[in-house]
């Protein structure tokens, strides 16, 4: 039978993740790092406050891979030396309150090794494979750091949002055309991640980007 929501603090499930409430804290910009990218005490304190506030699940701030990406200064670099130590401490902290946490990966631009801001129509198949390999590597890092899942940002007019949008994507091969082909860049990654990691996978998408 159907489940009736009586209270926003009722327990529920997000996929196979058990949540203490229906409240999901979405990803934000933290921008509070010390030299070398290490997290400040304020970030740890904030995560603990969120976890013990009744939140059902937490989606992290944006994680970035390329230091030249547009929002890199406001993001956490997944390649800094303290990533595993800092974020294992974060995930252990929120797990004390039985709150699952997903790491959010985003590309505003994409650097395919030839063009720092390659457009969806211009990226080669090799470039697409490179992007997908980077997403898989990010999933591996998140898994090692104790995250329960991963959110791939395919919204906010970021790179993957533009790639799946026919306004920007006029490709005529297997990654362009109908909706299934345009989202293939993401759906292939989701399958690979689910086949290889015990991570809950979600995607952030725009219901409408105000373009015709």
Region roles according to the model:
Residues 1-212:
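Flavin-dependent oxidoreductase catalytic cores
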């Amino acid at each position: 039978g159907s489940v009736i929501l009586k209270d926003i603090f009722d327990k529920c499930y997000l996929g196979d993740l058990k949540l203490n409430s229906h409240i999901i804290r979405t990803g934000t910009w933290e921008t509070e790092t010390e030299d070398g990218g290490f997290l400040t005490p304020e970030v740890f304190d904030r995560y603990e406050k969120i976890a013990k506030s009744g939140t059902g699940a937490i989606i992290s701030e944006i994680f970035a891979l390329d230091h030249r990406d547009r929002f890199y200064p406001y993001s956490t670099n997944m390649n800094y030396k303290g990533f595993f130590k800092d974020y294992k401490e974060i995930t252990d902290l929120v797990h004390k309150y039985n709150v699952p946490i997903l790491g959010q990966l985003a590309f505003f631009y994409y650097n395919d090794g030839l063009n720092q801001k390659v457009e969806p129509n211009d990226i080669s198949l090799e470039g697409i494979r490179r992007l997908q390999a980077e997403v898989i590597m990010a999933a591996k890092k998140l898994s090692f750091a104790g995250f329960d899942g991963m959110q791939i940002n395919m919204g906010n007019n970021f790179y993957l949002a533009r790639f799946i949008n026919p306004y920007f994507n006029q490709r005529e091969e297997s990654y362009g055309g109908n909706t299934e082909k345009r989202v293939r860049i993401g759906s292939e990654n989701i399958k690979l991640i689910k086949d290889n990691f015990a991570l809950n996978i979600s995607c952030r998408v725009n219901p409408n980007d105000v373009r015709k």
